[in-house]
Amino acid sequence: MIMSVMASDSARAVVCTSRPFPKQKLRELVLQALYALEMAPKGEDSLVSLLMTEASVSKKNVLYALMFCKAIRANQSELDALLNATIRTTTLANLTIIERNILRMMLFEHQQNQESSPIPTAVLIAETTRLIKKFSYVEGSSLILAVLGSIFDQVAQEPASMCG
């Protein structure tokens, strides 16, 4: 299986995997890596062994998750601008680190999949709910789901470009 991830507009990382890594587990690893790097931005070297131990996954899978993490971080300013423009009752900075990173990760995945093979928004919303229940608190889910729902609805309503 070959997957590509946009790290920025000019760079695309291509990763070959022999066996598909479960997307749920991948999202959990990416979320944990995003959290760890926000807490200790210089800690990427120790992060590989920590995630291997804590998540019981191979080095290859951790490196694969870190590739997604780096792509999200490379696009963080654009993601945050869209999120801040959508959030009405507070700011992105006032959310917990986990909530911010769930929003960034799911928005990034939604944007990336619009270009290749779209994942239904219902699946992304269900996965967001699962991650909130596992890593955050349920009370925060309504804001996160409302923000993502609003963004996903805007994208769905945009007219497709016409070739002339």
Swiss-Prot record:
<keyword id="KW-0889">Transcription antitermination</keyword>
<comment type="function">
    <text>Involved in transcription antitermination. Required for transcription of ribosomal RNA (rRNA) genes. Binds specifically to the boxA antiterminator sequence of the ribosomal RNA (rrn) operons.</text>
</comment>
<comment type="similarity">
    <text>Belongs to the NusB family.</text>
</comment>
<dbReference type="GO" id="GO:0005829">
    <property type="term" value="C:cytosol"/>
</dbReference>
<dbReference type="GO" id="GO:0006353">
    <property type="term" value="P:DNA-templated transcription termination"/>
</dbReference>
<dbReference type="GO" id="GO:0031564">
    <property type="term" value="P:transcription antitermination"/>
</dbReference>
<dbReference type="GO" id="GO:0003723">
    <property type="term" value="F:RNA binding"/>
</dbReference>
<keyword id="KW-0804">Transcription</keyword>
<dbReference type="InterPro" id="IPR006027">
    <property type="entry name" value="NusB_RsmB_TIM44"/>
</dbReference>
<keyword id="KW-0805">Transcription regulation</keyword>
<keyword id="KW-0694">RNA-binding</keyword>
<protein>
    <recommendedName>
        <fullName>Transcription antitermination protein NusB</fullName>
    </recommendedName>
</protein>
<dbReference type="InterPro" id="IPR011605">
    <property type="entry name" value="NusB_fam"/>
</dbReference>
<dbReference type="InterPro" id="IPR035926">
    <property type="entry name" value="NusB-like_sf"/>
</dbReference>
<dbReference type="Pfam" id="PF01029">
    <property type="entry name" value="NusB"/>
</dbReference>
